[in-house]
Amino acid sequence: MFSLTQKIGFNAEKTACRYLQKQGLSFITKNFRYKQGEIDLIMSDQSMLVFIEVRYRRFSDFIHPVATVTPLKQRRLIKTALHYLQKHRPLDKISCRFDIVGITADRQITWIKNAIEVEY
C-alpha cells in the first residue's frame, strides 16, 4: 500500500514523463535507486542521456518546486547517475545532463535543462 505522498509523487513523475515525451525525449527508466539516492526519470534527448529530478509542490506561493533541490540532493543525484553509468557501460561514453521538472498543484510545469552543473 502506498502513502498519499507516494501516490502524489508517482502521479507527478507520470505527468513529467508525458510532458517530456511530448517535447521529444524518449523514456528509458524510472526510479533508479542506489544507496541513498534515487533518480526519478532517465530519458534520452537525441544522443544525450538525461537524468531528471521531478518536484511537486501543492503550495508554491513561497517557494517554487524547482528551488527545493538542495546541494545535498544534487550530490546524491550525481552519485546515483555515476553508478547508473558504471552499471550500463556503453552509456558511459555519451553526453549527460541533469534536468529538473517542477510541477505545481494547478499542473503548471517548469522544465529546467542543465539545472545541475557537473565538473569532471
Swiss-Prot record:
InterPro entries documented for this protein: Restrct_endonuc-II-like, tRNA_endonuc-like_dom_sf, UPF0102_YraN-like
Coiled-coil intervals: none
Highest rank taxon of the organism: Bacteria
Annotated GO MF terms: nucleic acid binding
Gene3D superfamilies (alphabetical): 3.40.1350.10
A Pfam short name: UPF0102
SUPFAM superfamilies registered for this protein in UniProt: Restriction endonuclease-like
Family affiliation: Belongs to the UPF0102 family.
Protein's recorded name: UPF0102 protein CBU_1742
UniProt organism field: Coxiella burnetii (strain RSA 493 / Nine Mile phase I)
